[in-house]
């Protein structure tokens, strides 16, 4: 069973096994959650989602995690464009 360890706005972070789960509580758990290994990175991802910012040093897994969490279409599209740019 997971235990909530942090919440900021609609984002909850749960301790799960050897990592953490971030869930956007405004969306279905199945569609709007992601798994992260460190608590520090989980909090960073929550902060990026709330401020709708792009990571300074983007990598594929981080962008995909942000895309799974957000329910904002404009932010999702910015993340998708960034992800496509990394694939070139």
Label each region the model flagged:
Residues 1-22, 31, 51, 60, ...:
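Short N-terminal "domain-start" leader segments
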Residues 25-41, 49:
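A short, exposed loop/beta-hairpin motif centered on an aromatic-Gly-Thr core
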Residues 44-56:
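Short, surface-exposed secondary-structure junctions/capping segments
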Residues 56-65:
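N-terminal DNA-binding module of tyrosine recombinases/phage integrases
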């Amino acid at each position: 069973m997971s235990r909530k360890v942090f919440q900021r706005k609609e984002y909850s972070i749960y301790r799960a096994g050897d990592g953490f789960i971030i869930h956007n509580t405004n969306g279905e758990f199945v569609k709007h959650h992601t798994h992260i290994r460190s608590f520090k990175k989980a909090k960073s991802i929550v902060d990026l989602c709330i401020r709708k910012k792009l990571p300074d040093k983007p990598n594929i897994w981080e962008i995909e995690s942000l895309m799974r969490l957000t329910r904002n279409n404009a932010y999702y599209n910015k993340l998708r464009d960034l992800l496509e740019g990394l694939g070139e």
